[in-house]
């Protein structure tokens, strides 16, 4: 099973394709994955294969570990560009997510004021008031929308609970532009069916959704590491560039990771 489980609560720093030198904050257990999606491309593997036995780190554990690591990096003269909530699952699912965001912003302001605070989220819980208020306080509120096709979402993102893409789009609209939309494009098959979302059938409706959401930026990327479903393929640079050009024509800044 060639997938990645990250240390918790702090890992890195790592060089992010999209964010620069990133110090990771993992709010999930250090021995498994807890996520509201079960994506067939997730670098952490399938949920059922990565059931954790350890608890999530507490708010105090996160604050203490982050402060220690930032002080160490400061002493070494190597400060991060960004503090990134990511890791083994959905960060907003942590019961103390909002408080942890408060602590992180305070530590950032005190120890590395030039760094940004980023959250990588699948947006399944972005409608919750306490999650929304916390996400509005971070610099980079990066929310996933791989497609607006309900069947594709069920097959590829595999939500573990109720997921209505139209309701999610309404939630994304409610952020009034304080969000970055992140979308993964890929090719290949899963269980004998195509998962290619680079064609007009998927890209056209997705672009219409972007127009209604009006994000501050769009990040498009493709798979970069081994995936639990082994029949997936990268989208080509040419395909990603063509999609990016269409995003730019809508007036949104776009970054592409190949």
Residue ranges of predicted features:
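Auxiliary Fe-S-binding modules of radical SAM enzymes
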Residues: 1-18, 71, 187-258
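Canonical Radical SAM [4Fe-4S] cluster-binding loop centered on the CxxxCxxC motif
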Residues: 18-64
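Short hydrophobic-acidic sequence motifs that mark active-site Asp/Glu residues
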Residues: 22-24, 82, 142, 180
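Short strand->helix junction
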Residues: 32, 90-91
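Conserved alpha-helical substructure of the radical SAM core
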Residues: 46-82, 96-99
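Residues at or immediately flanking beta-strands
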Residues: 79-82, 116, 217, 253
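Short glycine-rich or small-residue beta-strand-to-loop segments that form or flank ligand, phosphate
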Residues: 83-88
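Conserved AdoMet/S-adenosylmethionine-binding subsite of the radical SAM
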Residues: 93-221, 226-233
């Amino acid at each position: 099973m060639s997938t990645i489980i990250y240390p918790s609560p702090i890992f890195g720093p790592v060089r992010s394709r999209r964010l620069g030198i990133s110090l990771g904050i993992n709010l999930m257990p250090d021995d498994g994955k807890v996520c509201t999606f079960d994506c067939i491309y997730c670098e952490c593997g399938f949920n059922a294969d990565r059931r954790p036995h350890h608890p999530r780190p507490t708010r105090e554990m996160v604050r203490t570990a982050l402060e220690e690591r930032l002080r160490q990096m400061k002493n070494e003269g190597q400060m991060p560009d960004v503090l990134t909530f990511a890791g083994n699952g959905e960060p907003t699912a942590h019961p103390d997510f909002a408080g942890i965001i408060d602590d992180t912003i305070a530590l950032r302001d005190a120890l590395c004021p030039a760094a940004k605070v980023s959250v990588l989220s699948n947006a399944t819980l972005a409608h919750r008031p306490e999650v929304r208020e916390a996400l509005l306080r971070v610099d980079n509120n990066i929310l996933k929308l791989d497609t607006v096709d309900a069947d594709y979402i069920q097959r590829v993102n595999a939500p573990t609970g109720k997921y209505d893409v139209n309701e999610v789009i309404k939630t994304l609209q409610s952020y009034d532009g304080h969000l970055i939309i992140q979308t993964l494009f890929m090719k290949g098959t899963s269980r004998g069916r195509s998962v290619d979302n680079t064609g007009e059938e998927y890209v056209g409706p997705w672009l219409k959704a972007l127009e209604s959401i009006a994000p501050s930026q769009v990040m498009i990327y493709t798979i970069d590491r081994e995936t639990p479903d082994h029949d997936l393929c990268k989208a080509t640079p040419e395909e990603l560039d063509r999609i990016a050009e269409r995003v730019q024509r809508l007036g949104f800044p776009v970054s592409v990771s190949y």
